[in-house]
Amino acid sequence: MKKVYLSLSLLSCLLFNGTLFAQDFYQEQRAGWLDIAEATKPTLIETIKKTIGIVSVVKDEKAYQGWKVFPKQPMDSLYTRSMKKQSGVVLDFGEHLTGFVTFKIEDLNRAADAALRLKFTFAEVPAEAALPFDPYHGQLSRAWLQDEIVTVSEVPNTITIPRRVAFRYLKIEVLGSSVYSDFKVSDISVKATTSVKEPAAPLAATTPDLIKKIDQIGLNTLKECMQTVYEDGPKRDRRLWIGDLYLESLANIYSFKNHD
């Protein structure tokens, strides 16, 4: 019995003391690991991408997740008219992108006499642009959902949203503006980033079209996950998980061959 009590006492000390669990066995090596990581961090390739047009998001039971997009208007119709009259407009970049959004704000007819507030919703699929994010009942952090509220106090101005986003469609809503003055937005672009330097070699000409499409989607996905590390996803979690690192590294060896 004494041995049992002694064992229980020792276990209690370990559990409630916490000293053993607080030790960092790799403390001396961590600084060196960070230096190596910084020295081998790849340079990101930046490409400016523009929107291809305004689209309508329409309910369609046969479409993926019940929503489909149709071309609506060219971008000039947004850039030359009042943004207040176009709140809720949805833009299509024509492809999935990962990067940083920049836009210009300008006065229309008279100088702004109040701050402007805009909401940007970044959607990977049409349903995200059509359906509201709130109320949110998911278990993951609400902050992972890609919507940003931007307040502009000075007009004219060029604004870059600091959050990196991954999306294809962009919805812009006007949350607040002066009743006396008007404004317009223009020159919306994305600075897309990736560490991929060269495109992958094309498949053989005899490859079936379906396989070519699957391969292209896979390459686009891999390219956007290849940032300063192999990310598990450019939207979420944006982390270097060991399983994703292994799979993405294998795919890179046989596609982009980006070994820097």
Would you name each region that the model predicts?
Residues 14-16, 225, 258:
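Hydrophobic alpha-helical elements and their junctions with loops/disorder across both membrane
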Residues 247-258:
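Well-ordered alpha-helical scaffold segments within catalytic/enzyme domains
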Residues 234-236, 248:
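Hydrophobic, small-residue-rich membrane helices and short re-entrant helix-turn-helix hairpins
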Residues 238-245:
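Aromatic-lined, polymer-binding surfaces characteristic
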Residues 1-23:
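Bacterial Sec-dependent N-terminal signal peptides
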Residues 23-232, 244, 260:
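Extracellular/oxidizing-compartment recognition motifs
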